Regions:
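C-terminal accessory/regulatory regions appended to core domains
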Residues: 1-162
C-alpha cells in the first residue's frame, strides 16, 4: 500500500515497526533533539530558528507517538490510509454483540466484590488474549514487510476492537 503522509519513523530515523525497541526510540530522540535544538540556532537567521523550532516540535511529537504502543499502531494505520475520518468501518456483528453483552454484565456486577472483580478481570483478559491470537498472523506479516490491504485491514480491525 502507498503511504499517504510523512511518518514519525522517518523523522526519528527508525525502521517502520509495530515493535520498536523503547531504548532505540529514546536514543534517536535524544540524538536528534540535541542536533536540532533551537538554542544551536540562536545566532542564525529567523528562518533557521523557526525551522529548528518546527523540527524540534516534530521530533517531540514523533517521540510521544512512537513511545506509546496504541498511538504507534494508530500512526501506522494513518500512514497507510486505514483510518479515514468519518469513514464507516463495520466490525463483525458477533464481536459487537459479545461486547454489548459483556458491558451489560459488567454494569450489573458488583465490582467492589473481590470475587466478582476477579471474574470480570478474567473475562477481559480472555477477550484480550483472543484478540492478540487473532491479530498475530497480521502483525507477523507486517513485521516481515508485507503492507498489502489485507494485512493492514487485519491490523486495523484489531486496533478498532482493542
Amino acid at each position: 500500500m502507498d503511504k499517504l503522509r510523512e511518518n514519525y519513523f522517518d523523522i526519528l530515523e527508525l525502521p517502520e515497526s509495530l515493535n520498536v525497541n523503547a531504548s532505540d526510540i529514546r536514543k534517536a530522540y535524544y540524538r536528534l533533539s540535541r542536533q536540532h535544538h533551537p538554542d544551536h540556532f540562536s545566532g542564525g537567521s529567523d528562518a533557521e530558528r523557526n525551522k529548528a523550532i518546527l523540527q524540534s516540535e516534530l521530533i517531540n511529537q514523533a517521540y510521544k507517538v512512537l513511545s506509546d504502543d496504541n498511538l504507534r499502531m494508530k500512526h501506522i494505520l494513518d500512514i497507510y490510509g486505514m483510518l479515514v475520518e468519518n469513514e464507516q468501518i463495520s466490525l463483525p456483528r458477533e464481536f459487537l454483540l459479545e461486547m454489548m453483552e459483556l458491558n451489560e454484565s459488567f454494569e450489573e456486577s458488583d465490582l467492589t466484590d473481590p470475587v466478582v472483580r476477579a471474574d470480570v478481570e478474567e473475562v477481559v483478559e480472555s477477550v484480550e488474549e483472543d484478540l492478540v491470537e487473532e491479530v498475530s498472523p497480521w502483525l507477523k506479516k507486517f513485521e516481515d514487510g508485507q503492507r498489502d490491504k489485507q494485512v493492514m485491514e487485519g491490523i486495523r480491525d484489531y486496533y478498532l476492537k482493542s
